[in-house]
Amino acid sequence: MKLVNVQEMKQLDQLATAEYAVPGILLMDNAAQAVADAVNDSLDELDGESVVVFCGGGNNGGDGFGAARWLQNYGARVRVFVVGKALDAVTGDAAAELAMLQKTDAKVEAIVGEDDWVVAELAAAKADILVDALAGTGFHGEPEGDLLRACRLMNDSEKYIVAVDVPTCVNADNGAVAENAVRADKTVTMALLKTGLLLYPGREYCGDIELADIGMPAKMVEECASKKYRLTDDIVRELLPLRKADAHKGDAGRAVICAGSPGFTGAAALSSYAAVKAGAGLVALYTPLSSRDVLAGKLTEVMVHGLLERMPGILGGGATGDVVKNANAADVLAIGPGLGTSESTQQVVRDILLQLQVPVVIDADALTALQGHTEILTQMQAAKVLTPHPGEMARLIGKEISEINADRINIAAQYAQEWNAVLVLKGAPTVIACPDGTVYVNSTGSSALATGGSGDVLTGIIAGLAAQEITLQEAAVCGVYLHGKAADISGIDIGLAAGELAQFLPEARCEVLKGN
């Protein structure tokens, strides 16, 4: 499903009218009917129910005027309050919708003084449902004056709120919210999903999100310049590797994992086990010699090999050749989980990356090895995927975590292209950015994934999929989606252990392939 930012949506609106001869009033009225239908669906029936619509003076308000007219036709008792503008000051398509509304029995009044606010507050208190049509995707910053008061009125009402396109004062680009942004129970967004509706904290203010088809020409939407997508079963189904009926373990691919150290054997075990559960035919784990026996006892399906150490848990230079030789004979390498952050080990990691010729998943301690050495990423011959959480990403690029979370999509896209890497920026939601500028926003998973080892499982999933004759980019997209879907189908909200998560992977894969 394609995603757009505010500027891209504005360009589509203009293109629909200028190049495809679609009247703006037609698009507005289709949007209005979609909002009215959403209100209707939110109530058992509209016959005699009270709906109060708060409208601004722009196009978002125009959608509200039209929705009020449709609701009146559906049998609701409708009252409309125009905030921040006199009725005769409304212009454009919104004025046309207002004129049609005024021909109905709906009450329409502008809030121009304190007495009007008292009336509006009383009406909202008696309403069954409120509609937020105050300000659309173009609004940024903090609300002031009448707009601020209207936002507070709706939030304080404790009524069910349906927002038009985006809740007022939620940034439709990056999900930032003003202090008094409207908290909607349902958001009806028009034509295409806006990125800010999927990013926190804005996502929390949207409630249920409905995408409305308002009659945008399909050809125009398909040719939209945006390369941003929300992941769905349909997208992932086309990318997942399939297995022939007569396949043997060699056909299913070989994954090498370089991970673990004393005290951190769990990370190595989880990533290795996840690679198996993701479908890799053969998985070999290379770990410091002092961790080998512990991990061999934990992993019955994985071949465990010890690496030369300078001292227990600290890799020496001799480990480099062993990992490179065996990884280059396989289909993919995953490196980093629990490997350790000693300078000697970190240098081994850097040397491995520079000598590697097969695709590699770089995570955890291997990302730490790249701090201050990101030039290695552009020097590498191998295709690569990086899987940082916001803290790791912040350290890699010298920014604050808050800066990363405030601009997840753009930052991920920038560095994926700069480093010529697939960048999996973990979080809510996880963003997958590709070197060609394509960005995917994940739609699966929940806070159930907020548990130690979850990231190690993701690393193993991506490696296990990449071993099966799909590209690293495809493996990252599928891996992130299946990782979240496994958590979803577990039915566990709190207390989902990372090892349990991996056990749901085959079921998650089957659900995607079957279209469930």
Per-region residue spans from a language model:
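Short acidic loop-to-helix transition motifs that present clustered carboxylates
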Residues: G113-W117, V166-A172, T195, L367-L370
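Small-residue (G/A/S/T)-rich helix-start motifs and N-terminal tracts that mark the onset
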Residues: M1-G84, T91, A95, L197-V360, ...
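Internal gly/pro-rich beta-alpha loop/helix module
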Residues: A124-I129, L134-S226
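Nucleotide and nucleotide-moiety/phosphate-recognizing core
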Residues: D37-L134, E142-V164
